[in-house]
C-alpha cells in the first residue's frame, strides 16, 4: 500500500513524487515509457554524433519561470544563453525591415492600436479563475478572425500570425484567439514576453535535471502503462497493462491530457470534463531540428512560409549549424525531405540541407500530442476543471496549468498544487 501513486514521469510527476517522498510519504512512480522526462527530451542528435539536442521543451526564462529556476539552482544544473539573433532574413513583404522587430515605420500607428486591443483583451483574463469562468466566449474564436478585426497592415499582420503559429502549433484558422491571449496573460500581460521567454537553455540537456530529480524517488517503474484507476473502494486501485494492480490512498495523474481517454476511471470523471478529454486538445505543434551547411550564426527568419519561424539552434562546425523550425504536423510532413529543403531554401537559398531530426509526439501513444493548444471553443467551456481533483485523483502537468500552460514551469506549478492538497488532506 502506498500513500500516493504518481502516473507519469515528466517534470510534473517527478516533482510530485519527489516532494511527497521528502515529506515522508511512501510513493510509487509509474512511467509508461523507457525514459523519464516526458516532453522534455534531450538525446544525441540523429545527424551529428556526440551532440546532445532538445527534441521537446528547451527554453526558459528565470523571471517568468521561477519554479524551474529554483530547481536548476537546487541541483546546480548549468544553463546557457539561447542563440542570439544577429542576422535576419524575413519573408514578411517588400516593406519589412530585416531586423529583430521588422515592422516598418509606416505601420507604427496601426500596430499601436492593435497592441492596445491585444493587451486590453488579455487583461480580461484572470489566470487563477480558469477560462470557463470569466465570460470569455467572445474571444474563443478562430485566430484568423480575431486578427482580421485588428485591421493590421501586411507586415505586422504576418509577423503576428507567424509567431502565433510558432507558439500555438496550429494554423490560424484552427487556433483559438483566446489561447493566444492566455499566453500573453501568462507572461505578465506582455506580448513581447511570449517571444522573449526564449532566453536560456540547458547547457547539457534537460536530462540533467530529470536525472537529478529522479535520484530522490526510491521507487520508479518504467514501461508500466496505466490502463485503469478505480477509487470506488476504500483505497484507489491502479491497474497497469499487464493486469497487475497497485493500491494507494491518493493518485496523481501526470501524463499528457490527450492520453487520459485511454485510462478507465471508476467512477467516471464528470461529464463536462470528460467531453473535452475525449476530444483531446488540438495542438499539432512540430519542432524540427535541421542540419545545414552555409547558414550564418545567429540567423532568424520569420515569414509566410510553411515554416513560420526558422532560426539558429547551435553550431556544429565552422561551416555547419543546426537550425530549428516550427510549424504544425497537419500542414507539413517532416518525412518529406524535399519539402524540408524547399521550406528552408524559401528563406535561405544559399544553404545546403544535410539532415533533419524531430519526434512525432502525436503518433507517440504515450503522448498523443505536443504542447497543449485547445481547439476553438474548448477551454471557454472547460478549462480549470481539467486540473481539479476528482475525489482522490489529482491531475497535473503543463497541459492543465493555469499560470504557464505548455511550459516546464506549468508542470512544476501543478505538481506543487497537488502535493499541497495531498499533504493537507
Curated annotation (Swiss-Prot):
Changing residue 166 to A: 30-fold decrease in kcat/Km and kred for (S)-6-hydroxynicotine, with larger effects on the kcat/Km value for (S)-6-hydroxynornicotine. It catalyses: (S)-6-hydroxynicotine + O2 + H2O = 6-hydroxypseudooxynicotine + H2O2; (S)-6-hydroxynicotine + O2 = 6-hydroxy-N-methylmyosmine + H2O2. Pathway: Alkaloid degradation; nicotine degradation; 6-hydroxypseudooxynicotine from nicotine (S-isomer route): step 2/2. It comes from the Bacteria. Its EC number is 1.5.3.5. It holds the Pfam family Amino_oxidase. (S)-6-hydroxynicotine binds at residues 166, 311, 326, 371, 407. Inhibited by (R)-6-hydroxynicotine. Inhibited by high concentrations of phenanthroline. Activity is strongly affected by Hg(2+) and p-chloromercuriphenylsulfonate, but not by N-ethylmaleimide and 5,5'-dithiobis-(2-nitrobenzoate). InterPro entries: Amino_oxidase, FAD/NAD-bd_sf, Flavin_amine_oxidase, Flavin_MAO. Its cofactor is FAD. PANTHER family: AMINE OXIDASE, AMINE OXIDASE [FLAVIN-CONTAINING] B. Homodimer. This is (S)-6-hydroxynicotine oxidase. It comes from Paenarthrobacter nicotinovorans (Arthrobacter nicotinovorans).
Amino acid at each position: 500500500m502506498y500513500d500516493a501513486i504518481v502516473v507519469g514521469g515528466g517534470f510534473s510527476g517527478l516533482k510530485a513524487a519527489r516532494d511527497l517522498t521528502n515529506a515522508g510519504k511512501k510513493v510509487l512512480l509509474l512511467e509508461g515509457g523507457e525514459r523519464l522526462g516526458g516532453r522534455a527530451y534531450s538525446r544525441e542528435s540523429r545527424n551529428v554524433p556526440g551532440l546532445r539536442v532538445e527534441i521537446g521543451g528547451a527554453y526558459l526564462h528565470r523571471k517568468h519561470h521561477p519554479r524551474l529556476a529554483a530547481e536548476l539552482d537546487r541541483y546546480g544544473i548549468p544553463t546557457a544563453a539561447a542563440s542570439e539573433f544577429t542576422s535576419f532574413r524575413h519573408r514578411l513583404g517588400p516593406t519589412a525591415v530585416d531586423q529583430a522587430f521588422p515592422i516598418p515605420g509606416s505601420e507604427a500607428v496601426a500596430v499601436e492600436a492593435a497592441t492596445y486591443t491585444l493587451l486590453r483583451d488579455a487583461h480580461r483574463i484572470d489566470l487563477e479563475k480558469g477560462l470557463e469562468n470569466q465570460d470569455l466566449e467572445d474571444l474563443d474564436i478562430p485566430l484568423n478572425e480575431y486578427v482580421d478585426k485588428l485591421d493590421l497592415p501586411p507586415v505586422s499582420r504576418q509577423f503576428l500570425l507567424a509567431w502565433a503559429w510558432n507558439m500555438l502549433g496550429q494554423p490560424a484558422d484552427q487556433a483559438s484567439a483566446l489561447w493566444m491571449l492566455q499566453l500573453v496573460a501568462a507572461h505578465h500581460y506582455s506580448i513581447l514576453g511570449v517571444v522573449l521567454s526564449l532566453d536560456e537553455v540547458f547547457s547539457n540537456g534537460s536530462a540533467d535535471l530529470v536525472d537529478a530529480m529522479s535520484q530522490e524517488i526510491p521507487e520508479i517503474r518504467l514501461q508500466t502503462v496505466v490502463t485503469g484507476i478505480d477509487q470506488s473502494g476504500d483505497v484507489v486501485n491502479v491497474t497497469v497493462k499487464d493486469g497487475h494492480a497497485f493500491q494507494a490512498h491518493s493518485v496523481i495523474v501526470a501524463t499528457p491530457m490527450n492520453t487520459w481517454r485511454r485510462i478507465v476511471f471508476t467512477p467516471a470523471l464528470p461529464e463536462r470534463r470528460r467531453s473535452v478529454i475525449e476530444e483531446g486538445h488540438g495542438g499539432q505543434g512540430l519542432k524540427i531540428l535541421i542540419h545545414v551547411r552555409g547558414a550564418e550564426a545567429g540567423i532568424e527568419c520569420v515569414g509566410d512560409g510553411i515554416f513560420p519561424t526558422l532560426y539558429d539552434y547551435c553550431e556544429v562546425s565552422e561551416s555547419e549549424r543546426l537550425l530549428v523550425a516550427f510549424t504544425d504536423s497537419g500542414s507539413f510532413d517532416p518525412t518529406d525531405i524535399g519539402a524540408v529543403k524547399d521550406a528552408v531554401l524559401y528563406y535561405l537559398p544559399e544553404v545546403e540541407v544535410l539532415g533533419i531530426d524531430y519526434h512525432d509526439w502525436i503518433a507517440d501513444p504515450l503522448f498523443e500530442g505536443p504542447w497543449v493548444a485547445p481547439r476553438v471553443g474548448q477551454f471557454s467551456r472547460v478549462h480549470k476543471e481539467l486540473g481539479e481533483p476528482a475525489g482522490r485523483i489529482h491531475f497535473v502537468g503543463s497541459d492543465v496549468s493555469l499560470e504557464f500552460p505548455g511550459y516546464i514551469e506549468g508542470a512544476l506549478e501543478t505538481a506543487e498544487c497537488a502535493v499541497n492538497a495531498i499533504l493537507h488532506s
